[in-house]
Swiss-Prot record:
MF GO annotations: toxin activity
Keywords of the record: Cleavage on pair of basic residues, Disulfide bond, Nematocyst, Neurotoxin, Secreted, Signal, Toxin
Name the record gives this protein: Small cysteine-rich protein
Propeptide: 18-19
GO cellular component: extracellular region; nematocyst
Organism field: Anemonia viridis (Snakelocks anemone)
Signal peptide boundaries: 1-17
Length: 64
């Protein structure tokens, strides 16, 4: 996924984003496209999910 700072979010740009996998650029960044290829027991975070830390892949753990 690609994560960007909230103030840089442009909804139209989000929909045009070709990248499917990337890490967050900074703490507090936001996922702006869905991930493919997340590891087992993880799923693609929803759009605008807040990244926990630099390098977060935007794959979220499955619960339950």
């Amino acid at each position: 996924f690609v994560c960007v700072q909230a103030r840089q979010i442009d909804p139209e740009q989000i929909l045009r984003t070709p990248e499917k996998r990337a890490s967050c650029s900074s703490r507090g960044g936001i996922c702006r496209s869905t991930s493919i290829g997340c590891p087992r027991r993880y799923h693609s975070c929803h759009l605008f999910h807040h990244c926990r830390s630099h390098g977060d892949s935007c794959c979220c753990p499955n619960y339950g």
